[in-house]
A protein has these predicted regions:
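Short, Lys/Arg-enriched, disordered terminal segments
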Residues: 1-4, 18-19
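Sec-dependent N-terminal signal peptides
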Residues: 3-13
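Carbohydrate-active catalytic/glycan-binding domains of CAZyme proteins
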Residues: 18-345
Length: 345
């Protein structure tokens, strides 16, 4: 990633910056619907969708009391439906605790095991309320789900580039072609104070689903921290012989790469801009992204709101829908976009 940063800066100096292209993935996206309206007194966030072996759709998402905060009071709940449009039936509060926050789930299947990864904040313990990565597994989407005895499977500790890791969250789980297990996640170090730090993408790998997970020695694999912009909310997958990663452009990476960086005091943090999609042969060297998805304003004609937390719903080994969390004026978990005839390049 350091090499990529140097190449990028050199290209700016040489006047070679170009507009990011709209990806073939983005071109395949068709508006769906807003779903899962929040109940009174709560707000909802993020949707992790998956079909079971009988074709029933399951969604895991975060529910937070309006009088609380996601950092301390988020829980992961479980819904089912026959189709992405719904209607949805509440199943259960899957993970909820007075001592921890469970947030931003992502669900996958590895062999005969369902894997749920999530942000875990055990705010009552001695670690200073650090955000870390948790995992739970089950043989059925209906449970029982078992939290990993190794939780947090990726702690907010250790060293990265000579700095201390102080944050690990928003994970996405991938099975590699070699049969190993990777968790890509948002990382931050103490290179700068936490509130001034910039989000990077790192990964850890294991020979077993449950772990232990070992951080890649050359983390982070995607970073623009030196340019004081960042990305987050990775959703990674391996498809048609390539790794892909869809992310939220949190602070104007697109503008930076196009040679027109937004002044720091004018950046509006969050998913108020199109998301990005990266492609890689090895899941380590990611290169320059393309536009991965547009905003809710483009898809629905609504007032611009934060579109974040991309998650793909897969059917018969192919991507069917892209789900996005959205903070709009109507309190829903977000919306989905149909993926029609994606021409993988």
């Amino acid at each position: 990633m350091k090499t990529l940063s140097c190449i990028f800066l050199l290209s700016l100096f040489c006047g070679q910056a170009h507009s990011l292209e709209e990806s073939s993935f983005c071109k395949a996206l068709v508006p769906g619907e807003y779903i899962l309206p929040a109940e009174d007194g709560t707000w909802t966030w993020c949707m992790a969708p998956i079909y079971d072996e009988k074709g029933k759709l399951h969604i895991f998402n975060s529910v937070i009391p309006k009088k609380g905060s996601w950092i301390k009071h988020s829980k992961i709940v479980h819904w089912v439906a026959d189709q992405p449009e719904g209607p949805y039936t509440f199943v259960e509060d899957l993970f909820s605790s007075d001592d921890a926050s469970y947030h931003n789930p992502q669900v996958s299947m590895a062999g005969d095991t369902y894997v749920l990864v999530f942000l875990l904040n055990r705010y009552r313990d001695a670690n200073g309320s650090k955000q870390e990565v948790g995992m739970a597994t089950a043989k059925s989407l209906d449970g029982p789900w078992t939290e990993s005895p190794l939780n947090p499977v990726i702690p907010a500790s250790g060293e990265m580039n000579g700095c201390q890791i102080v944050h690990a969250s928003n994970p996405t789980f991938v099975v590699t072609p070699e049969g190993k297990y990777r968790i890509y996640y948002k990382s931050m170090t103490d290179k700068l104070p936490l509130k001034k730090g910039f989000r990077e993408i790192s990964f850890a790998e294991s020979d077993q689903i449950e772990g232990p997970y070992v951080n890649y020695e050359a983390n982070p694999v995607i970073s623009y921290a030196d340019q004081q912009v960042d990305i987050e909310d990775p959703y990674a997958f391996f498809y048609e012989g390539m790794y892909y990663m869809i992310v939220e452009d949190r602070r104007g990476v697109q503008n930076l790469l196009e040679g027109n960086p937004i002044p720091a005091d004018q950046i509006r943090n969050g998913g108020y801009r199109p998301g990005l999609i990266y492609k890689s042969k090895d899941g380590i060297n990611w290169g320059v992204p393309e536009i991965g998805y547009q905003t809710n304003e483009i898809y629905f004609g609504d007032k611009l709101a934060r579109s974040e937390r991309p998650n793909i719903l897969w059917k018969d080994g192919k991507p069917e829908c892209l789900f996005l969390a959205c903070h709009d004026e109507d309190p829903t978990a977000g919306y989905f976009l149909k993926i029609k005839n994606w021409n993988v390049e």
